[in-house]
């Protein structure tokens, strides 16, 4: 009620009390000045006046007639007036039968940039445009502007006037809305009440990665959008049927190749035992898309695998060096081993520490075994090279050479029951003669050499005892029954060392080729 109406009311009340003017005339005159209700007055008794003061915006909403002559801002203000629109309440949608149904929200995601796919932090950064489309019948203006086909568009100011669904990224670590002078947000309202919101954002998302086939791994990084406040009884999320997830044609990654994407819709249950939405319980709608990535292996092949193959090959050069060249073969083996370990450590620093074995670690272990094996082979042939006794072989084959190499004459000496002891003899000069009558009564004289006090070596004493065993006739019956094995070939220790080196020149490369065949088959076929 305005000031003019109150003034007229007081004037008429004063006149009626003084001159007895009828109250009906007063009500007729006040009808055009506001919503004032005056109770009937009794001129003889004290009268009372009841005035109902209320705002015109509550009783009467702003009219939308002649909307064609209104400015867009005025039209939006009247459409979103509190008497018509409550931005705190989601729109109510009915089906064809008039039943209330959940509101469908359709999403589309356009990705401009993907970067910082960090294996150590298990995260990646994405810049994209997120669009949400839904129907709000309260904002339909086709009946007021039948000739308008274009949507009403605005930025963040328009968005603040509307109800907008709260959608969040469940695996985000940080996110922000992009923009320079203002946030890059665009809101469009179509004549039928369809609302389309577009937001350009940047988000750092968590991505669980599996490195079992590193560096030949394929990663699947997932992005999940979920309704925060409203469960499936009110809001349901869906992907657009046409290109729900798309990528910029100029999108390039430094370490990965983008091979495609998958998208999915699901439901998450929130209850007392799984409080994903705080104190809110119910089923919440989820939409997600997964980016399929394959790692670029060019860098690792050139900087790791080829150099490691060359280092392993260089370690085999020692097989062409003579077994007594200790400095050369030792230096070559140690240098190649240390070089390969240094090369591997520089690559492993790029990988997150995981509890399972990766393909790169398998490669590292096998290559280390090959390099270390060449060092062990040198130590073995060098030991054989320094032996003094020849090897007695039945046949000059690998079987008997290896057997004679690992099982020396010690076995034969133990079989005859002799112990290797150091014998010390004092200075003496004796000549012993064993006379044995031959078939023709011939006397055989055996002269024993004089041994001047000294210590016999283990090997010489064993040989001396062995020779006496073969010529003596007074041995026990058990030892006389055993006959020494017949030998058909003899090899010197140097010949054995050279023979082993020649064999290793083929065994090591062939074994490494077989390993490579198995390794690359597992990499690309499993």
From Swiss-Prot:
One of its GO terms (biological process) is positive regulation of TORC1 signaling. Residues 322-327, 382-505 are cytoplasmic. Pfam families: Neur_chan_LBD (PF02931), Neur_chan_memb (PF02932). It is a multi-pass membrane protein. Disruption phenotype: Larval lethal. Larval development is delayed due to decreased food intake and reduced systematic insulin signaling. However, escapers eventually attain a normal size during the pupal and adult stages. Unlike in wild-type larvae, mutants do not develop a preference for zinc supplemented food or eat more when fed a zinc rich diet. The copper cell region of the larval midgut displays developmental and functional defects such as reduced luminal acidity, increased bacterial titers and enlarged cell volume. The interstitial cells also display increased cell volume due to reduced basal infolding. Its main location: membrane. PROSITE patterns: NEUROTR_ION_CHANNEL. GO terms for cellular component: apical plasma membrane; brush border membrane; chloride channel complex; late endosome membrane; lysosomal membrane; microvillus membrane; postsynapse; transmembrane transporter complex. The keyword Glycoprotein applies. The gene is pHCl-2. The lineage of its organism: Eukaryota, Metazoa, Ecdysozoa, Arthropoda, Hexapoda. This is pH-sensitive chloride channel 2. Disulfide bonds: none annotated. Residues 19-300, 348-360 are extracellular. Residues 1-18 form the signal peptide.
């Amino acid at each position: 009620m305005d000031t003019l109406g109150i003034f007229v009311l007081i004037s008429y009340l004063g006149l009626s009390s003084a001159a007895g003017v009828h109250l009906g005339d007063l009500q007729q005159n006040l009808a055009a000045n506001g919503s004032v209700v005056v109770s009937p007055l009794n001129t003889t008794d004290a009268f009372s006046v009841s005035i109902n003061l209320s705002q015109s915006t509550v009783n009467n909403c702003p009219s939308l007639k002649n909307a064609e002559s209104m400015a867009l801002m005025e039209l939006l203000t009247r459409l979103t007036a509190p008497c018509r629109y409550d931005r705190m309440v989601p729109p109510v949608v009915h089906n064809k039968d008039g039943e209330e149904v959940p509101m469908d929200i359709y999403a589309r995601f356009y990705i401009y940039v993907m970067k910082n796919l960090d294996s150590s932090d298990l995260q990646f950064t994405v810049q994209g445009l997120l669009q949400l489309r839904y129907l709000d019948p309260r904002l339909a203006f086709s009946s007021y502007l039948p000739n308008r086909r274009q949507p009403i568009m605005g930025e963040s100011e328009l968005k603040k006037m509307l109800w907008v669904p709260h959608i969040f990224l469940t695996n985000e670590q940080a996110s922000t809305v992009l923009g320079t002078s203002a946030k890059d947000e665009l809101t469009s309202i179509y004549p039928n009440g369809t609302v389309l919101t577009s937001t350009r954002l940047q988000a750092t998302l968590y991505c669980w990665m599996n490195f079992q086939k590193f560096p030949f791994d394929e990663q699947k990084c997932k992005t999940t959008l979920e309704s925060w406040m409203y469960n499936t009884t009110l809001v349901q999320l869906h992907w657009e049927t046409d290109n729900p997830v798309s990528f910029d044609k100029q999108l390039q990654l430094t370490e990965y190749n983008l091979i495609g994407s998958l998208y999915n819709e699901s439901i998450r249950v929130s209850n007392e035992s799984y409080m994903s939405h705080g104190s809110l319980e119910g089923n919440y709608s989820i939409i997600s898309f997964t980016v399929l990535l394959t790692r670029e292996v060019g860098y690792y092949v050139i900087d790791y695998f080829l150099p490691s193959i060359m280092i392993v090959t260089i370690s085999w050069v020692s097989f062409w060096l003579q077994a007594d060249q200790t400095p050369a073969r030792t230096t070559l083996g140690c240098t190649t081993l240390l070089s390969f370990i240094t090369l591997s450590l520089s690559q492993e620093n790029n990988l997150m520490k995981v509890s399972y074995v990766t393909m790169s670690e398998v490669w590292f272990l096998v290559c280390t075994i090959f390099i270390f094996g060449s060092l062990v082979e040198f130590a073995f042939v060098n030991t054989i090279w320094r032996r003094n006794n020849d090897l007695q072989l039945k046949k000059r084959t690998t079987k008997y050479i290896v057997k004679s190499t690992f099982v020396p004459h010690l076995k034969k000496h133990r079989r005859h029951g002799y112990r290797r002891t150091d014998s010390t003899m004092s200075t003496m000069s004796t000549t012993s003669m064993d006379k044995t009558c031959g078939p023709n009564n011939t006397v055989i004289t055996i002269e024993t050499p004089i041994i001047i006090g000294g210590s016999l070596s283990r090997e010489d004493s064993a040989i001396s005892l062995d020779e006496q065993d073969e010529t003596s006739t007074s041995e026990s019956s058990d030892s006389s029954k055993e006959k020494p094995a017949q030998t058909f070939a003899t090899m010197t220790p140097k010949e054995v060392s050279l023979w082993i080196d020649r064999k290793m020149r083929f065994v090591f490369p062939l074994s490494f080729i077989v390993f490579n065949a198995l390794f690359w088959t597992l990499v690309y076929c499993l």
